[in-house]
């Protein structure tokens, strides 16, 4: 690591944390209170609750799921409190001079590590390693999936009020879940409830901010000030929590930690930079509402923008000036607020020097640290060779749209634009020439619709890609090779609890065929028809470069009996294949965990003896359907994989729907590994077959 980067790292580590509202992180910070008995790991309680639900033990399901949620909250609280406690008790010492200059610093690091381990083990009632969970479980809790099971279990127990509360909590983080929305309406109608529903996982800083905006718009400025100030205290507290949680274990993408050949400082840098980037992006996390991908634009600065005028309206000009100057720390060139500053200064008594009024103290240290983090990350990216693009966390499109944007007495020219993105954005552009209408290559294939007829971009619908006999053969082999949850990280019902998902890859099919567990001819058909589909897509869209397989998957989804009444959820929610669809912002974010390297997609259907299961395209709002396609044997829909083609699958309400799903890439670096292995298996099989024909053995000679 370069000298300047190492020095910056030390400076950042030694920079005192911004002061918070509430308890301070001083030397006298009290130790977290010990737990009564060992804390049970929330992932085990969650698994037990789900198992109880599916076995019909609804009381047990409620008991374990509620315990899992309590354990999850308590674990988060313990980690945060221990981080605060150890930061106060074991401050990092600055390096000295001369031989062993770095030893005081690393000694302090080791002491803090020991403090953290001891604190967590004592409060958890055992080693912290017991509470490390899989990405799937972490994702379920982030998406509030336990509340989905809870609302169903509470309904079975005739506890309507608790079911309604759990359903609302789940829906707030999953606003696209139509079934849950309908459940809530049904619960309200049955219980005749008029009071607002409670979100059990509501973020206090967002709730207070929303309340502040509501009072501000009603010209109740005293109440608005109360809630905005409360929102800021809660924001800074939540920022501290977020940063503490970033200090947990990190993933090392380029190497396994124990097998690393990197030096001491490379290992330190790798881990610390991941922690630092996580902490730096807490501002995005705190500005993002549950279930949304994009943050509220200009979120933190808007608190001070609202406050500066609210304080002006109640006659507190010094505080108005402090808040206006705080806002300028984010947007120093905002002419409206610069004018406000001049206006507020003109209202001060003669005894007050305007130059002595500085920006809010609660923000100064926060912004200083944020800027230092940005400089360090940029420096490290250049010196250590990793890529990082600094987001514009405080983006603003002109402020708020209201008559109170500028105080009376200050010139107002032109209309203001609301700070939040409300308008519908145009679909994202594809970074290559768009063409279609190339040859279909094979006889008997029937062209059905093109992009224009399907009301979109880069779309095509074809029939007779498979014959009836091939469909039957593929359906038959599917029953012999498919495994529940295959391709979905073992999840039986990854998208909806009302259907069972089974899948298999080409390589698995060939392996089963080679072992004689399914007919080799049928396994080979799976391989051959996927290659046929690839050639058709490459030819029809007139691509100038080779189209490679990114992932090939045979999948069947089966409607579960007894769970189809009043269904209005989707078998597969609306999404895009290479970006994260954000319907509220009308955006599709091309960033992990999306498969950003995918360029084209295709679905080849094998049957139509089921109900529901229509494939649908929508606008980027994930609601407006632009095309609906009924699957049948031999039908293939293909389209470009980006945000220009949001799509999903309607609920399968009876029977089993089977298809071959194919994703393609134009980048050879992202070729499907199993496909390359399958190519090698096919080459061996072809060679063996050729050898048999070449020898031309007379069966009588074998006697």
From Swiss-Prot:
The keyword Endoplasmic reticulum applies. Glycans are attached at residues 444, 455, 544. Residues 552-666 form the Fe2OG dioxygenase domain. InterPro entries: Leprecan_dom, Oxoglu/Fe-dep_dioxygenase_dom, P3H, Pro_4_hyd_alph, Pro_4_hyd_alph_FE2OG_OXY, TPR-like_helical_dom_sf. A motif (Prevents secretion from ER) lies at residues 700-703. Belongs to the leprecan family. Prolyl 3-hydroxylase that catalyzes the post-translational formation of 3-hydroxyproline on collagens. Contributes to proline 3-hydroxylation of collagen COL4A1 and COL1A1 in tendons, the eye sclera and in the eye lens capsule. Has high activity with the type IV collagen COL4A1, and lower activity with COL1A1. Catalyzes hydroxylation of the first Pro in Gly-Pro-Hyp sequences where Hyp is 4-hydroxyproline. Has no activity on substrates that lack 4-hydroxyproline in the third position. This is Prolyl 3-hydroxylase 2. It comes from Rattus norvegicus. The gene is P3h2.
């Amino acid at each position: 690591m370069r000298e300047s980067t190492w020095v910056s790292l030390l400076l950042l580590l030694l920079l005192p944390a911004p002061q918070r509202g509430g308890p301070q992180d001083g030397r006298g910070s009290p130790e977290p209170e010990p737990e009564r008995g060992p804390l049970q790991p929330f992932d085990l309680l969650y698994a037990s609750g789900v198992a109880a639900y599916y076995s019909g033990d609804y009381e047990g399901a409620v008991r374990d799921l509620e315990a899992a949620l309590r354990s999850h909250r308590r674990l988060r609280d313990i980690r945060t409190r221990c981080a605060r406690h150890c930061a106060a008790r074991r401050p990092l010492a600055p390096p000295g001079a001369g031989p062993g200059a770095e030893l005081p610093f690393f000694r302090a690091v080791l002491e803090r590590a020991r403090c953290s381990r001891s604190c967590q083990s004592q409060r958890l009632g055992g080693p912290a390693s017991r509470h490390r969970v899989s990405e799937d479980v972490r994702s379920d809790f982030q998406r509030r999936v336990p509340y989905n099971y809870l609302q169903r279990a509470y309904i079975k127990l005739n506890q309507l009020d608790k079911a309604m509360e759990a359903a609302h909590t789940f829906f707030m983080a999953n606003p696209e879940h139509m079934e849950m929305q309908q459940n809530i309406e049904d619960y309200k109608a049955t219980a005749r409830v008029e009071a607002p529903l409670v979100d059990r996982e509501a973020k206090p800083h967002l709730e207070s901010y929303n309340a502040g905006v509501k009072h501000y718009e009603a010209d109740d400025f005293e109440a608005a000030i109360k809630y905005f100030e409360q929102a800021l205290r809660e924001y800074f507290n939540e920022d501290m929590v977020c940063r503490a949680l970033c200090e947990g274990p990190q993933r090392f993408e380029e190497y396994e930690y124990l097998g690393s050949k990197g030096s001491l400082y490379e290992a330190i840098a790798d881990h610390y930079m991941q922690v630092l980037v996580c902490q730096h992006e807490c501002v995005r996390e705190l500005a993002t509402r549950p279930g949304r991908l994009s943050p509220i634009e200009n979120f933190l600065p808007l608190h001070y923008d609202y406050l500066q005028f609210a304080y002006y309206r109640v006659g507190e000009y010094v505080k108005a000036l402090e808040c206006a100057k705080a806002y300028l720390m984010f947007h120093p060139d905002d002419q409206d607020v610069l004018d406000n500053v001049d206006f507020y200064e003109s209202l001060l008594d003669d005894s007050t020097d305007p130059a002595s009024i500085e920006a809010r103290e609660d923000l100064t240290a926060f912004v200083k640290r944020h800027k230092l983090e940005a400089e360090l990350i940029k420096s490290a990216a250049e010196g250590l060779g990793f890529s990082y693009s600094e987001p514009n966390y405080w983006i603003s499109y002109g402020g708020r749209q209201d008559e109170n944007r500028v105080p009376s007495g200050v010139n107002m020219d032109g209309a203001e634009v609301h700070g939040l993105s409300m308008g519908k954005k145009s679909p994202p552009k594809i970074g290559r020439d768009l063409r279609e209408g190339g040859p279909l290559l094979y006889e008997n294939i029937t062209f059905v619709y093109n992009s224009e007829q399907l009301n979109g971009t880069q779309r095509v619908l074809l029939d007779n890609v498979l014959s009836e006999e091939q469909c039957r053969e593929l359906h038959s082999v599917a029953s012999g090779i498919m495994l529940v949850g295959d391709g979905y990280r073992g999840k039986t019902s990854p998208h909806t609890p009302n259907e069972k998902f089974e899948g298999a890859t080409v390589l698995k099919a060939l392996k089963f065929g080679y072992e004689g567990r399914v007919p080799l001819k049928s396994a080979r058909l799976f391989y051959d028809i996927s290659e046929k589909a690839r050639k058709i897509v490459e030819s029809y869209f007139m691509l100038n470069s080779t189209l490679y397989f990114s992932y090939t998957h045979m999948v069947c989804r089966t409607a579960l009996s007894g769970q189809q009444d009043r269904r209005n959820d989707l078998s597969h929610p609306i999404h895009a294949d290479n970006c994260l669809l954000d319907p509220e912002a009308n955006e599709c974010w091309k960033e992990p965990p999306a498969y950003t390297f995918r360029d084209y997609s295709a679905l080849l259907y094998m049957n139509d003896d089921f109900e529901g299961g229509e494939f649908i395209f929508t606008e980027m709002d994930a609601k407006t359907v632009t095309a609906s396609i009924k699957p049948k044997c031999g039908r293939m829909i293909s389209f470009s994989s980006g945000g220009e083609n949001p799509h999903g699958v309607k609920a399968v309400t009876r029977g089993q729907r089977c298809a071959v799903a194919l994703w393609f890439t134009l980048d050879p670096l992202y070729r499907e590994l199993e496909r390359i292995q399958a190519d090698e298996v096919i080459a061996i099989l072809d060679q063996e077959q050729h050898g048999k024909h070449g020898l031309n053995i007379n069966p009588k000679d074998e006697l």
